[in-house]
Regions:
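Interfacial loop-to-helix junctions that mark the boundaries of transmembrane helices
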Residues: 3-12, 62, 87, 138-150
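Short cytoplasmic-facing helical segments at TM-TM junctions of multi-pass membrane proteins
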Residues: 169-175
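Hydrophobic/aromatic residues within the transmembrane alpha-helices of Major Facilitator Superfamily
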Residues: 17-18, 25, 100, 104, ...
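Residue-level recognition of pore/gate-forming positions within transmembrane alpha-helices
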Residues: 48-49, 72-73, 98-102, 157
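Transmembrane helix-bundle core of multi-pass membrane transporters
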Residues: 102-166
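Membrane-interface starts of transmembrane alpha-helices
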Residues: 59-67, 90-93, 97, 145-152
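N-terminal presequences and immediately downstream first alpha-helices
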Residues: 1-13, 107-108, 115-116
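Single transmembrane alpha-helix segments in multi-pass membrane proteins
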Residues: 8-57, 65, 74-91
Length: 175
């Protein structure tokens, strides 16, 4: 019984940690380039609330995922323009993005329909692998019971590692 609890805890941790893996991968690239980005949490909040809004408006989780990623990228570009091009203090812009993201997500989130929130609060993407893979003892649920976003995030981590440590541009980034 204790093994089951441990495995289920790890499965939930992998699933719930996916947004942090994606944000952390981007943050590693940002920090390696010499930019202090304290606005990651604000970008995540903006991406989450706009993704939720787009999913509830279009009834398509793929549209919501793309809109959330695009809006977080837009806020990332705002931070880049302010911090790099305009030479504004990186701490101030990062904290400002967190405050803006918190306020906007709270305001937009309050406008949401509670029925839609309940509907979208569970997993909206289907697992990639068939159910027979989930039955493998030990590693089955941990490796094969996730939706495509989890596997894409693992791919981004591997791609970022390859880029940073195996390419000339990555070497320039680390220098």
């Amino acid at each position: 019984m204790n093994n089951w609890i441990l495995i289920q805890s790890l499965v939930v941790a992998v699933s719930a940690g996916t947004p942090l893996v994606l944000a952390g991968t981007g943050e590693v690239l940002t920090e390696r380039s010499g930019v202090l980005n304290l606005g990651v949490e604000g970008m995540m909040l903006i991406g989450a609330v706009t993704g939720f809004w787009a999913t509830s408006a279009s009834s398509s989780p793929v549209v919501g995922l793309l809109v959330g990623a695009a809006s977080a990228a837009a806020f990332s570009m705002i931070h880049a323009v302010l911090a790099i091009s305009m030479r504004v203090n990186q701490i101030v812009t990062g904290v400002g993005l967190v405050i803006l993201g918190t306020g906007m997500s709270s305001f937009i989130g309050d406008q949401g329909d509670p029925a839609v929130v309940r509907k979208l609060s569970g997993g909206i993407f289907e697992p990639v692998f068939p159910d027979s893979f989930h039955d493998w003892p030990g590693i089955g649920p941990l490796l094969f019971s996730h939706d495509p976003v989890v596997y894409v995030s693992w791919g981004f981590v591997a791609l970022a590692e390859w880029y940073i440590f195996r390419t000339r541009r990555g070497m320039n980034l680390r220098a």
